[in-house]
Amino acid sequence: METAAFETDLSLFKYDNLEQLPPSYRDLDADERTERIESALAELGDDVVILGHNYQRQEIVEHADFIGDSYQLSKEAAQSDADYVIFGGVTFMAESADIITDDDQSVILPSMEASCPMAGMAEALQVDAAWAELTAALDDEEIIPITYMNSYADLKAFCAEQGGLVCTSSNAHKAFEYAFEKGDKVLFLPDKHLGENTAHRLGMADETVEWDPWDAEGTDAADAVENDVILWEGYCQVHERFREHHIESIREDYPDANVIVHPECRREVVEAADVAGSTSTICESVAEADPGETWAIGTEIHLTHHLQRWHPDVNVVPLCGDACMDCNAMRQIDPNYLAWVLEELVEGRERNVIEVAPEEKELAQVAMDRMLEI
């Protein structure tokens, strides 16, 4: 494997031109902040819609018009007539909303620092270099790229250009089936665990290999293309934390517990759980549970806390107890930022607007449309 000099060109904060929180907003107390947010929302009325991701803290979710996963929220944005879409999520989510909303709608991400680390693990420079190596190593076979929704718009656009598509954690298996109808091999980005779990679900567990763009001694391209599924070395830091011993401990403490985990978890964790599914699946499973049932949740801790509040008759417990993590990127959407961007809109000023370049936007839409077709 060859490695390129990425260090000077890569940045976790893709939108590092966005503005920071003004000093006057940094020390707002909770009561004043809530009052100011509600006042601004009352003045803006139907001109604004707030989207709250399942992983957001309660102080954001309580002001949200819609709560859900990233793709659900993007669809809600597209169906809204609001001029301003405030996304309580991370950068790639705001990009996805901008891709599918009308051009006259503005998508606002309150904090520039809400950048998903996993999305940043597969940047265009790295993917272009890997693609050149992999395709050069192929003879007559074709490789189809699939990117998880948790990726930047430029990666979605790349996949469209190369005949690939986008997937969610719910339809990744369908994306794989589509890709193997069109080609011979799959490059799955950026989450290796979702890719591996999907390959395992389709009976391809022994046909995968990892591709690490940072490892000069890693898999050679000629060796990589001997496998049907090439998994990009990316992962969610929250979900990778879960281990089998967490499930073993839960089963000791709660013998009748139902263990449900996100498919971004390691394969051995997914196999040891009772159910694996998207955040929507997790929410639906708890909502449909009988009173008194115990559900151990293997995902970001704020969703577990929401489920505890929403379903007090169900015993909802975090899979790894106090060791369960919140998403650091989601944490950057501080409610003080929400107060700031709302009050700026009241004054006629748009702050921290996420705009995907037109050509990139058009191609990314193609990749997302292919997903909808399956």
From Swiss-Prot:
UniProt-annotated binding residues for iminosuccinate: H53, S70, Y148, M149, N150, S169, H262, P263, E264, T279
Needed cofactors: [4Fe-4S] cluster
Subcellular localization(s) per the UniProt record: Cytoplasm
Domain of life: Archaea
Keyword annotations from UniProtKB, A to Z: 4Fe-4S, Cytoplasm, Iron, Iron-sulfur, Metal-binding, Pyridine nucleotide biosynthesis, Transferase
UniProt keyword Hydrolase, yes or no: no
GO cellular component terms attached to this protein's record: cytoplasm
The protein's enzyme class: transferase
Residues engaged in binding [4Fe-4S] cluster: C116, C236, C327
Record pathway: Cofactor biosynthesis; NAD(+) biosynthesis; quinolinate from iminoaspartate: step 1/1
Molecular-function GO term, any one: quinolinate synthetase A activity
Cofactor note: Binds 1 [4Fe-4S] cluster per subunit.
GO biological process, one term: 'de novo' NAD biosynthetic process from L-aspartate
One Pfam assignment: NadA
Catalysed reactions, semicolon-separated: iminosuccinate + dihydroxyacetone phosphate = quinolinate + phosphate + 2 H2O + H(+)
Keyword Metal-binding applies: yes
EC numbers: 2.5.1.72
Described function: Catalyzes the condensation of iminoaspartate with dihydroxyacetone phosphate to form quinolinate.
Family: Belongs to the quinolinate synthase family. Type 3 subfamily.
NCBIfam families, A to Z: nadA (TIGR00550), PRK09375.2-4 (NF006883)
The name this protein goes by in its record: Quinolinate synthase
